[in-house]
Amino acid sequence: MNPSTLPAPPLAEVYDVAVIGGGINGVGIAADAAGRGLSVFLCEKDDLASHTSSASSKLIHGGLRYLEHYEFRLVREALAEREVLLAKAPHIVKQMRFVLPHRPHLRPAWMIRAGLFLYDHLGKREKLAGSKSLKFGANSPLKSEITKGFEYSDCWVDDARLVVLNAMAAREKGAHIHTQTRCISAHRSNGLWEMNMERADGSLFSIRARALVNAAGPWVAKFIRDDLKLDSPYGIRLIQGSHLIVPRLYEGAHAHILQNEDQRIVFTIPYLNHLTIIGTTDREYTGDPAKVAITEGETDYMLKVVNAHFKKQLSRDDIVHTYSGVRPLCNDESDNPSAITRDYTLALSGGNGEAPILSVFGGKLTTYRKLAESAMAQLAPFFTQMRPSWTAKASLPGGENMTTPERAGRRHPRQIRLGTERDAPRRWATTYGSRTWRLLEGVQALADLGDHLGGGLYTREVDYLCAEEWATQPQDILWRRTKLGLFTTAEEQDNVQRYLSKVGQTRAKIEAA
């Protein structure tokens, strides 16, 4: 059936807000809007966080290097958001100290001290410790010629889970979240948006909405141009960022921020107890955002930066995994990809009887919540009964009544000490927080967790992720929601595929009966 011939749904199915895109900005806006009493529909053509939002450096940070580009508003907002997100989701956001080795020929010490002074004082800081100078001794993992440096605080986050938790928060406030669902066309009609949707199985349906939010990330301009047949108010620059994952590079829970000769920086970040993330790069990208992959040049670049700083030398043979994403930045005509603003721009059109559309250009993981508040402020004139902002103090799912993940492991020890792998209870706590008890509801013995598929993953957890977190494919579970893809064999990953296929066949038989 041609989308243009799809019948419009009855008026009872009109939503206040329809959101295109299941990345961090889309789900953040959906949650904010739903919590203000608006009816919300969100569609994502793939899985939640399946592109940019799961390919970040996994940091909640002010952006120390943005100070060099005079982005004081963005840095101030991001610094304040660190503490907000620490309180909202303590199971997936944690404090982290960052060590900055001093290389005098790149940036003088006074410049770094001035930047760190601003970093300490621009934003509200209660939980995070301030910066200080360091001297490195013989036990330092850094090369012997690097004798001094600095240390400051930022935060680490499980980026994909941050997206999923916001989607769950939106659903718990009444939003309808549809993954594997693509908006194939939309047009204005009688003061509403009429939107045509296609599910992964090819089935079609339509909805109507009073306002449309385009949070399609790398596809934001393409959606306006190709699916809405309108002109995009801004251009988009796709900047590729790639990362390496290697075995743990050094002891300790601190990250390093490494200065390079080209004035860029590269992070080394402790990851999942046994690994280190290295990244990121900045390069223009012109291909399909869904097919981005690390280049040979990026790999060599990051290895060279790390090997210039650390005693332990890395080669390609040390690489466990790589991942890449594209950052959809608002085109500010900068010649240097690293200098393009990471701030967001919201473009609103409509009014005077014409249904509004709000498009999101740019943005960064750290400031998604403030972006959502700004989006709702722009839409407020169209929804005069909308309730006030609410997300600053509200916990995300799993963060309720928690201060640290360790609390989850102490609350009901009988429930999680089941003879499973030693790391399983802590992994559950740092993945699901206080929602671990929903995962383990009724579990009294190891057998209640179902079959072991590999890497500490049991069928009970797979069932939970499918029922509660929109997981449908092995990669949704292994790479975005649990990260167990890094610790499972190809055969074990096939076990997950076989189990999902079996469950799907059983469900299909029940529905057909």
Swiss-Prot record:
Major site of localization recorded for this protein: cytoplasm
Pfam family, one: DAO_C
GO molecular function: glycerol-3-phosphate dehydrogenase (quinone) activity
Subcellular location: Cytoplasm
GO process terms (BP): glycerol metabolic process; glycerol-3-phosphate catabolic process
GO CC field: cytoplasm
Keyword Signal in annotation: no
Chain coiled-coil ranges: none
EC identifiers of the protein: 1.1.5.3
Cofactor requirement: FAD
Keyword tags: Cytoplasm, FAD, Flavoprotein, Glycerol metabolism, Oxidoreductase
Residues that hold FAD according to the record: 16-44
InterPro entries, sorted: DAO_C (IPR031656), DAO_C_sf (IPR038299), FAD-dep_OxRdtase (IPR006076), FAD/NAD-bd_sf (IPR036188), G3P_DH_FAD-dep (IPR000447)
Catalysis performed (reactions): a quinone + sn-glycerol 3-phosphate = dihydroxyacetone phosphate + a quinol
Stated family: Belongs to the FAD-dependent glycerol-3-phosphate dehydrogenase family.
NCBIfam families: PRK12266.1 (NF008899), PRK13369.1 (NF009906)
Name of this protein: Glycerol-3-phosphate dehydrogenase
Gene designation per UniProt: glpD
